Amino acid sequence: MSKRAYFGTDGIRGQANKHPMTAEVALRVGLAAGKLFRSQDERRHLVVIGKDTRLSGYMIEPALVAGLTSVGLDVRLFGPLPTPAVAMMTRSMRADLGIMISASHNSFADNGIKLFGPDGYKLSDAQELGIEALMDQGLQEGLAAPRELGRVKRIDDAQARYVEIVKATFPRHLNLSGLRIVIDCANGAAYKVAPTALYELGAEVITLGVSPDGTNINEECGSTHPEAMAKMVREYRADIGIALDGDADRLVICDEKGVVVDGDQIMAIIAAASHKAGTLKGGGVVATVMSNLGLERQLNTMGLSLERTAVGDRYVMQRMREGGFNVGGEQSGHLILSDFSTTGDGLIAALQVLAVMVETDKPMSALGRQFEPVPQLLENVRFVGGKPLEAAAVKEAIADGEAQLNGAGRIVVRASGTEPLIRIMAEGDDPALVKKVVKSIASAVKAA
């Protein structure tokens, strides 16, 4: 089996109570994962589960638990916890599998299931396909005997454990005393842990998006709506604003003037500081095809390279592991610092930026513009069915655009892994030409 029926680029994701994000599919994931582990050896296996604050988490979590325990796996429940924390706890608790129930930056109506291996890394494509192969078996197959059913326990101090891990990534000789920080937790998984970590490191903390009600996650707040954070930074005259997304694996920052700093600039800040300190590994940074050409040029001036991958933090992490890199990420704010974490961690990345601020005694406005971005335009075109990228007219429009840019820019056209969208991105030194190229390709996609 090579074609994915359930898993996309970031686990299983969709609208709650619609295929594939139903209680039945969650039950089948639990059953299939359990059967896969039991087929490998007969010992007791342990699975840990975390979730964000979506209402549908109350439906998905017990369905997963039912599937796992019915085939004899033990389960530990964390409750609301960031995705990177679940990855860390999977490893520290010697679990065989970690599961995060979240649709990240999507609205509350969506949910998702992400799987982590015992090393804290996202499962490989082959491992996910192995689970998929067992998901369509009958629900009565391979069940455990009554005495062999799994047991379930809640871990009450999971949030406190993660706070301590996060604080340990901040240099011991520094603290955040004297800094006024706005933190927007998107009414999501970090609503307790992020303000706590910043406060315990000495900051004056002003909170936003810390009142989840099950339906307000990412709603006009968080990393996808940084204007809320920026407004509060200006109002309270804060030194910096930090916005996380619903599962806290994504980070956007703004400076003391409310100017937003994206993932590319944050990578440049951390890479430059690490390079200066002699701690940058791999001779550069790993990012995706969507990262700005300006980042690549900036790194080149320091004698560093930018390695590009397909879109998706799993592919960034994969390249980082292959090449021995320790800084990578996406323009959208997924930032992976592999010295500290096995996946994107917004809070840890924010602390490393704060460390640079404190160490250099510079305001965020002096750090946030590491390079001048090359004009870049992104347009999303929704499609109903078919494969528009295979249409001859679309291929012709892309080739024509590349010819017009003539090596002084880039074009990336791809299908979203999580939504029925074609994402069209072009960048180059001539903004008018970039706009013309994007509009031409978008028109071809719409007509396909």
From Swiss-Prot:
Pfam families: PGM_PMM_I (PF02878), PGM_PMM_II (PF02879), PGM_PMM_III (PF02880), PGM_PMM_IV (PF00408). One of its GO terms (biological process) is carbohydrate metabolic process. Binds 1 Mg(2+) ion per subunit. Its cofactor is Mg(2+). The modification Phosphoserine is found at residue 104. Keywords: Isomerase, Magnesium, Metal-binding, Phosphoprotein. It comes from Caulobacter vibrioides (strain NA1000 / CB15N). Catalyzes the conversion of glucosamine-6-phosphate to glucosamine-1-phosphate. Its EC number is 5.4.2.10. Activated by phosphorylation. SUPFAM superfamilies: Phosphoglucomutase, C-terminal domain, Phosphoglucomutase, first 3 domains. CDD domains: GlmM. This is Phosphoglucosamine mutase. GO terms for cellular component: cytosol. The active site is at residue 104. Mg(2+) binds at residues 104, 245, 247, 249. Belongs to the phosphohexose mutase family. InterPro entries: A-D-PHexomutase_a/b/a-I, A-D-PHexomutase_a/b/a-I/II/III, A-D-PHexomutase_a/b/a-II, A-D-PHexomutase_a/b/a-III, A-D-PHexomutase_C, A-D-PHexomutase_C_sf, Alpha-D-phosphohexomutase_SF, GlmM_bact. It is an enzyme of class 5 (isomerase). It catalyses: alpha-D-glucosamine 1-phosphate = D-glucosamine 6-phosphate. It comes from the Bacteria. HAMAP family: GlmM_B. GO terms for molecular function: magnesium ion binding; phosphoglucosamine mutase activity; phosphomannomutase activity.
